[in-house]
Amino acid sequence: MADKKGSNSEKLLYCSFCGKSQHEVKKLIAGPSVFICDECIDLCNEIIRDEAAAAGVEASLSKSDLPSPQEIRDILDQYVIGQERAKKILAVAVYNHYKRLKHLDKKDDVELSKSNILLIGPTGSGKTLLAQTLARLLNVPFVIADATTLTEAGYVGEDVENIIQKLLQNCNYEVDKAQRGIVYIDEIDKISRKSDNPSITRDVSGEGVQQALLKLVEGTMASVPPQGGRKHPNQDFIQVDTTNILFICGGAFDGLEKVITDRTEKTGIGFGATVKSKQERDAGEVLREVEPEDLIKFGLIPELIGRLPVVATLGKLDEAALMKILVEPKNALVKQYQKLFAMERVELEIRPDALQAVARKAIRRKTGARGLRSIIEQALLDVMYELPTLKGVSKVIIDDNVIEGDGKPLLIYEDTPKVAGSN
């Protein structure tokens, strides 16, 4: 765009792309007879990032150097603490799944079946984080669905095909990419049928949803309305083949240990039986002995269990594991809060006794790793409220008394220490 002259006779410069003047933008960068503003540069960067990410999905799955199970496990270790056996099972299953996809075009007498995954473990043990980390590592579209919100088609609530619509939305409605994505269905245990006998009455949010999910997990052509649209009989639908989508289902399965224990105690009778008291066997150890018949007894239909051949169990996180979760992963909570405080030019120190107190509190609440953030947030609330208006604070120290609510954070000023909230 040509330069225009202002009223004060000096040249006013304009962006050659959007036409905004130099006074309407933060920065105007000059080239040979053209100018570009900071807003247009940001927009160009965003377009390039989106296209690079889209190209990366295809590239990541077409490369011969698909991460090995060991490499997948190593990356999971950076984000997820503990659950070693579950990480190994997941690494092998995901590697085999995407290796299978790479060889789909090759003609062979042996057809490789898809191996979907079932994660069993208590709340806050890392089920969702494992699935999220896998999707990030493989650079494929990913969506989390809550099984408790699903109903059979035709009833009030979300039908199962909405899951595929969300997956499409996450990859800008590019069907090829969606067909190689990962779907994580959480709370799968909450749609178990009420008894292990087939239901006579209609169960639209339990067994009925399992039947609907069965087709999706097994592989079907899902009909999804166009971008931003709702289902209508007279409109064209986008057809998505779910055959090559990896489904990971997760749930706490509260009460499954009792089902397993009842079965194993019946079989473990006689002179050669190994006797262990209930106190000696923790829930994680019991869950590792899960069999398909236990899941059927719990309330999952046999057909759905058959479509989830890879079962990984996660144990309850103990105090030591929770303390590691607070500090060791790449995006550990303590590192996040230290970064927040660093933005105020203040150093945050959370002492080991405070970390231990946070872990103990999470165990008491039975929230696992999921409850750690709320405990720290509650402990730091007052100091985060006051800090932006306080002058000269260089460091904040948190001990176990702060976590338990019996004390206040210690503020270190450039001159002398002071307790938060004191005058």
Curated annotation (Swiss-Prot):
CDD domains reported in the protein's UniProt record: RecA-like_ClpX (cd19497)
One function term, GO molecular function aspect: zinc ion binding
One GO-annotated biological process of the protein: cell division
Keyword set includes Repeat: no
Superkingdom to which the source organism belongs: Bacteria
Domain spans labelled ClpX-type ZB: 3-56
Pfam families linked to this entry: AAA_2, ClpB_D2-small, zf-C4_ClpX
Sequence positions that bind ATP: 122-129
Keywords of this entry: ATP-binding, Chaperone, Metal-binding, Nucleotide-binding, Zinc
InterPro entries, per the entry: AAA+_ATPase, ATP-dep_Clp_protease_ClpX, ATPase_AAA_core, Clp_ATPase_C, Clp_protease_ATP-bd_su_ClpX, ClpX_bact, P-loop_NTPase, Znf_CppX_C4
UniProt GO cellular component terms: HslUV protease complex
Residues bound to Zn(2+): 15, 18, 37, 40
Cysteines paired by S-S bonds: none
Family assignment from sequence similarity: Belongs to the ClpX chaperone family.
Quaternary structure and interacting proteins, as annotated: Component of the ClpX-ClpP complex. Forms a hexameric ring that, in the presence of ATP, binds to fourteen ClpP subunits assembled into a disk-like structure with a central cavity, resembling the structure of eukaryotic proteasomes.
Function of the protein: ATP-dependent specificity component of the Clp protease. It directs the protease to specific substrates. Can perform chaperone functions in the absence of ClpP.
Protein name in UniProt: ATP-dependent Clp protease ATP-binding subunit ClpX
